[in-house]
């Protein structure tokens, strides 16, 4: 009887997690966590841009981080002569890796958020607003929310684990299950957005890059 009950609970949970309406409502229910992660991203972006512009050390550190980022992009083996499908698949692989990593890291995904803010602030400083608008914004307006959602999902997952392991104030089984379900809904939504962002980056952004660098 207990096994049958657990199976029924699991099936109900999976049905809820993959319900599109529930997935779309999840950001509203978890807006406080998402706003917190968004605030970390925005403050990091603004603060790091100010530091990169005004302090040489941060500009130098930005050089190192950006060079490592370029090496990572080169490892994807994307060139201006590649077909769109190859580019999109390579971007998807990279984006989904970041998405899952963000989720697994939990609260430590805020460090990933800060590093991405550093890269964006450095690109804006190094290449100027025009290049930033053309080469980052087309896919960035989708990719950045996806990054924030995956990090938010990771934070929620951590909250569930803390409740489970330490059994603090709201550490009931129902509360733990709620956190895990909500975190997975945000993860699924972030994956969807990362897929869309990859298509935009592999088509629109890529075409803009070809025009600018040809």
From Swiss-Prot:
Keywords: Cell membrane, Membrane, Transmembrane, Transmembrane helix
InterPro entries from the UniProt entry: SpoIIM-like
Membrane topology summary: Multi-pass membrane protein
GO cellular component labels: plasma membrane
Predominant subcellular localization, coarse grouping: membrane
TM region positions: 33-53, 104-124, 132-152, 153-173, 186-206
Protein name: Uncharacterized protein MJ0706
Organism field: Methanocaldococcus jannaschii (strain ATCC 43067 / DSM 2661 / JAL-1 / JCM 10045 / NBRC 100440) (Methanococcus jannaschii)
């Amino acid at each position: 009887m207990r096994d049958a009950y657990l199976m029924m609970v699991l099936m109900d949970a999976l049905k809820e997690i993959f319900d599109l309406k529930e997935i779309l409502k999840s950001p509203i229910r978890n807006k406080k966590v998402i706003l917190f992660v968004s605030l970390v991203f925005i403050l990091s972006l603004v603060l790091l841009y100010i530091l990169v512009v005004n302090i040489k050390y941060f500009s130098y550190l930005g050089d190192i981080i950006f060079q490592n980022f370029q090496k990572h992009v080169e490892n994807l083996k994307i060139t201006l002569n590649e077909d769109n499908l190859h580019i999109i698949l390579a971007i998807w692989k990279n984006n989904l890796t970041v998405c899952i990593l963000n989720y697994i890291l939990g609260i430590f995904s805020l460090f990933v958020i800060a590093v991405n803010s550093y890269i964006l602030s450095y690109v804006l400083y190094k290449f100027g607003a025009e290049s930033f608008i053309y080469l980052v914004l087309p896919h960035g307006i989708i990719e950045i929310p996806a990054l924030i959602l995956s990090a938010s999902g990771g934070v929620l997952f951590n909250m569930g684990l803390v409740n489970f392991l330490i059994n603090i104030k709201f550490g009931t089984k129902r509360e733990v299950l709620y956190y895990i379900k909500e975190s997975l809904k945000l993860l699924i939504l972030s994956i969807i957005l990362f897929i869309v962002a990859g298509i935009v980056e592999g088509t629109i952004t890529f075409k803009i890059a070809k025009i600018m660098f040809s």
